[in-house]
Every structure is written in C-alpha cells, then in structure tokens.
Amino acid sequence: MPIKIPADLPACAALESENIFVMTEDRAVAQDIRPLEIVIVNLMPTKIATETQLLRLLGNSPLQVNITLLRTEAHESKNTPAQHLERFYKTFNEIRHGSFDGMIVTGAPVEHLPFEDVDYWHELLDIMNYAASHVYSTLYICWAAQAALYHFYGIPKFSLPQKISGIFNHDILLPDCRLFRGFDDTFTAPHSRNTEVRAGHILETPQLRLLAQSEQAGVTLVERVDHSQVFMTGHLEYDRGTLDAEYRRDVDRGLKPRVPEHYYPHDDPAAMPRMNWRAHAHLFYCNWLNYYVYQETPFSLTAIAQNREARAGA
C-alpha cells in the first residue's frame, strides 16, 4: 500500500522513479479505508533529503499512510527554501488540537549544545508532551532520541572523545520484540554523532527496555514497555551517500574528520560506499508501522488520547 503525499512534493518524483508506491491525494479520496496518520517532525537542516529518506521507507509498507510534515517556528531554516516550508510544512499550533497514529522526530546537528540552549527547545518540549498524550507511538531518531530520553526520564547525554561515524554491527538483545520480526541475528546501521546515552541508565529505568546495541557504537535501540516511544540513536533512514556527504562537508570545513568506519571499500573515500543496511531499514519501519501503530491504534483518532491515558496508568 502507498503513502499519500502531494503530487508536487519533490520527493514524489524521486520515489516514483525508484518504484516506491506513492499515491496522490486525488487518487486516495476514492478509497474507503482509514489510512494511518503519521506526522514527521523534521529538525534536520537538509529537510528535502530527510523527508525523502523517511518517505522511501514508509512508502514500502503494505499500509496507506497520510503524511504531515512539521517544522519548528522558533528556528529559521537556512538550508531549505522558504516556499518549500510554506507549501508542504505545518507548525505545531496548526496540528496540536488533533491526534496522530504515529510520529517520527528526526535528529538535528545541535548535540554540541546543552538541550536547554537549543533555540527551539521549549517548542520541542511542547511537541514531545503532545506526542505523549495525542500520538499512539512516537519514533525518536539520534539527537531527538537523546532529547526525549532526557526530557521524559532524566537520562543524560555524554560527549564522546571523537565522533562516531560509519556503519556498525548491532546485537539484538530482545529477539522476541516485534520490531525485529524478520531480522537476522545481527544487523548493520549507520551512526553519525558526537554524543551518547549509556546502557546503565536505560537498564535502571523500569519503563524502558534496551533492544539493541553495538560494541563500537553503544546503545542503538530502546523502547518504552508500552510501545508508545521508540528511541533509535542511529540512522537506518540514511541513503548510501549520506555519510559521504557529511564527511566531505567536514573536510571542506577543515575539521579533519576520520574516514567513516566500515563504509568505503578499503577505507578509500574515492570508492563508492557500501550500502548493507537497506533491507533491515525497510523491515524496521514496516514493523514499527504495522505492529506498534496499525495493529494497536484505535480506529477513531479521537480515542487516541483516552487510550494513551489508559496505557500510561497500566
């Protein structure tokens, strides 16, 4: 089944060229089923690239999904055309009185700052609190995962001596978790970050379960026991060339970055990067949509807030 997006969204043509099933709004109105309502809070500076990456994964599920793109008002984007934001994005005030089946909150390149110093921190707090009461399941990615763990559970982030960048192998700690249905015993995923959360803090928090970790990259997947929150410190959504673009950007800035690990053949940045996480990325997002959203969310969106209250009290 497809995702439903505007026909003139730049991602539409790109995804159709990759044989990803998308449906324009005009075609979708003829179908008499309730699609899932998913909101993507896009905090990345390269918003068009990020929305395309996530839509590629969401569009490969057997479910029809309505997508709402959300931006922050407190931060002015310098890397995305204003007309794109005005045409395709909403603000929190425009959606706060409704409910959603699922939410995805992306990472952001602000991890060098204390959380409270991020210019949209208070707005993000409102969004996260809203998600806790009006969204059935929320997926937090990279910095957003650290931000949510800090906000809801007081779990701190720690600076790393050097940036983690590359493709790393991960051990599945709870193979019966439905997010891992169809997974191999281990899986690879990209990481790109300067900070981490530590396993000990996760294990000390009774509302949370540590699902997967990497010997090199550390904590990777965490969930709240009622499935209402999923925290991913890596970037399964990344394209083949995303780490390459980040590496070359940092080289151009004179930062002397390390070559991303386990990424280029023979660690040669002139070679085409390997992409060995695509299958698990598609499977993870399909499992999240199906098992944590579609199979559990109420048919009526208006019942989500009541359902979330019941789950929180269970």
UniProtKB/Swiss-Prot annotation:
Kindly state a single biological-process term from the GO annotations of this entry. L-methionine biosynthetic process from homoserine via O-succinyl-L-homoserine and cystathionine
Can you state which reaction this protein catalyses? L-homoserine + acetyl-CoA = O-acetyl-L-homoserine + CoA
Annotated site (Important for substrate specificity): 192
What does UniProt list as catalytic? 142, 235, 237
User: Is Cytoplasm tagged as a keyword?
Assistant: yes
| Species name | Desulfovibrio desulfuricans (strain ATCC 27774 / DSM 6949 / MB)
Q: Where is this site: Important for acyl-CoA specificity?
A: 111
Q: What class of enzyme is it?
A: transferase
Identify the domain of life: Bacteria
- Pfam families noted in UniProt: HTS
| Pathway assignment | Amino-acid biosynthesis; L-methionine biosynthesis via de novo pathway; O-acetyl-L-homoserine from L-homoserine: step 1/1
Q: Which family does it belong to?
A: Belongs to the MetA family.
Q: What does this protein do?
A: Transfers an acetyl group from acetyl-CoA to L-homoserine, forming acetyl-L-homoserine.
Family annotation (PANTHER family): HOMOSERINE O-SUCCINYLTRANSFERASE
As recorded in UniProt, its EC number(s) are 2.3.1.31
**Which GO molecular function terms does the record list?**
homoserine O-acetyltransferase activity; homoserine O-succinyltransferase activity
Q: Which residues bind substrate?
A: 163, 192, 249
Indicate what this protein is called per its UniProt record.
Homoserine O-acetyltransferase
